[in-house]
Amino acid sequence: MPLTVNCPICKTPVEWVPQSEFKPFCSERCKMIDLGDWASEKHAIPVKSEFDLDALDELGYDEESFFKE
């Protein structure tokens, strides 16, 4: 008996077999909806910020003088 997973978009059961062309999605439509969600940044991979915002505050710049220099 093959493994069955739910489509991440519509929750339709999908058999995890080589014949399942769009796995883990049930269809091209659900695959494209997911791609659109990534492209519009509805999904994102969390990463640690490169910047320490507290350290930036310690530099002593205020917004007005920073842009005038």
Curated annotation (Swiss-Prot):
Gene3D superfamilies: Erythroid Transcription Factor GATA-1, subunit A. InterPro entries: DNA_gyrase_inhibitor_YacG, Znf_NHR/GATA. One of its GO terms (molecular function) is zinc ion binding. Interacts with GyrB. Coiled coil: none annotated. The lineage of its organism: Bacteria, Pseudomonadati, Pseudomonadota, Gammaproteobacteria, Alteromonadales. Inhibits all the catalytic activities of DNA gyrase by preventing its interaction with DNA. Acts by binding directly to the C-terminal domain of GyrB, which probably disrupts DNA binding by the gyrase. It comes from the Bacteria. Binds 1 zinc ion. This is DNA gyrase inhibitor YacG. The keyword Metal-binding applies. It comes from Shewanella sp. (strain ANA-3). NCBIfam families: PRK00418.1.
